[in-house]
């Protein structure tokens, strides 16, 4: 049970680093975090995913700008659900190789000393360091823990959210794309399950839009806000709306 608890804590921290920091804060500027919290999220992303903030932000912004077109980096409508669900990480690598897009869409991402000298040029050093730490602390089970951590974002974010989130589920809004909400209680993927709501109001720090929807990422933001560690910049109005309103 101890290892399962560690796995749950580590993987959920990674999910929160992606949804709160990379997505809601860096890509869409819906929320700002205290520098200590922001840097912790950036460090944890480097340690557990090897993803570079600027690249992630650029690819996601391009997804919104070119949604459901041939230029969308990961639309199941153009690439096929199987391709996005099972090869999401490969599509991400292909997208980050488009350096002109990274320049165009990645503006405003961190570019401080540690980003230029560690997080960007040595992105793969994070997971390697994590493998060493896991092995020292937990032995052979630590290697299994590391393997699951490495697969967590490629499966749940690149596969489930980017794939199923544009293919299956319910819609509150008739947005100009095929985005869907996978479940009203968004507890497992940091709130990213409410993908149609997000596409309707991309810059909103809160993804839940109806009284019976729950966004665990928003709960985390509110807790950090209560501690003076987060500042909400944009939030969509909470409306109990009828389904399929056009936006």
Describe the residue ranges of each PLM region.
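Non-catalytic, topology-defining segments of multipass membrane proteins
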Residues: 1-160, 164, 204-247
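Active-site-proximal inter-transmembrane loops
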Residues: 106-114, 168-194, 198-201
């Amino acid at each position: 049970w101890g290892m399962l608890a560690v796995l749950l804590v580590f993987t959920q921290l990674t999910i929160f680093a992606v949804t709160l920091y990379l997505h809601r804060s860096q890509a869409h500027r819906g929320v700002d975090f205290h520098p200590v919290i922001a840097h912790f999220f950036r460090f944890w992303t480097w340690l557990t995913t090897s993803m570079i903030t600027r690249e992630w932000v650029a690819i996601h912004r391009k997804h919104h700008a070119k949604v459901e077109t041939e230029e969308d980096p990961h639309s199941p409508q153009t690439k096929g659900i199987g391709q996005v669900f099972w090869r999401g990480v490969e599509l991400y690598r292909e997208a980050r190789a488009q350096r002109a897009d990274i320049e165009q869409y990645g503006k405003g991402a961190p570019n401080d000393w540690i980003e230029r000298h560690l997080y960007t040029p040595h992105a793969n050093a994070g997971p390697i360091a994590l493998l060493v730490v896991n092995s020292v602390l937990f032995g052979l089970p630590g290697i299994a823990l590391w393997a699951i951590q490495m697969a967590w974002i490629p499966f749940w974010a690149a596969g489930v959210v980017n794939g199923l989130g544009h293919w299956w589920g319910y819609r509150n809004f008739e947005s100009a794309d095929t985005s869907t909400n996978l479940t009203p209680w968004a507890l497992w993927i940091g709130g990213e399950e409410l993908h149609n709501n997000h596409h309707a109001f991309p810059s909103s720090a809160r993804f839940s839009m109806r009284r019976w929807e729950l966004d665990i990422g928003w709960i985390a933001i509110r807790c950090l806000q209560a501690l003076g560690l987060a500042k909400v910049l944009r939030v969509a109005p909470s409306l109990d709306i009828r389904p399929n309103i056009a936006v």
